[in-house]
Amino acid sequence: MAKKSKIAKDKKQREIVAIYAEKRRALKEAGDYQGLSSLPKDASPVRLRNRDSLDGRPRAYMRKFGVSRITFRELAHKGEIPGVKKASW
């Protein structure tokens, strides 16, 4: 489990990206790179890190399910992910 401060920081950063998204798009289309550089650093979507939606783990993130491999395994064993079952052959 990630530190609560990291999870909170990630949430705040995503909100900032959403707030400035339209303004960034307009500045990029206009080619106003000076204006882009005046925006906050955290307004750039490139700085976001994919994190597990349940416990905030930043590594081994599975984009399709939005969780880390560890959480995915636990949820799959419990049968809480539709269409996923243990392989058997």
UniProtKB/Swiss-Prot annotation:
Record-linked Pfam families: Ribosomal_S14
UniProt entry keywords in alphabetical sequence: Ribonucleoprotein, Ribosomal protein, RNA-binding, rRNA-binding
Highest taxon of source: Bacteria
Gene3D superfamilies given in the database record: 30s Ribosomal Protein S14, Chain N
Single GO BP term: translation
GO molecular function, one term: structural constituent of ribosome
A GO cellular component entry from the record: small ribosomal subunit
Record-linked HAMAP family: Ribosomal_uS14_1
Subunit structure: Part of the 30S ribosomal subunit. Contacts proteins S3 and S10.
Summary of the function given for this chain in its UniProt record: Binds 16S rRNA, required for the assembly of 30S particles and may also be responsible for determining the conformation of the 16S rRNA at the A site.
Family: Belongs to the universal ribosomal protein uS14 family.
Protein name: Small ribosomal subunit protein uS14
Species of the source: Acholeplasma laidlawii (strain PG-8A)
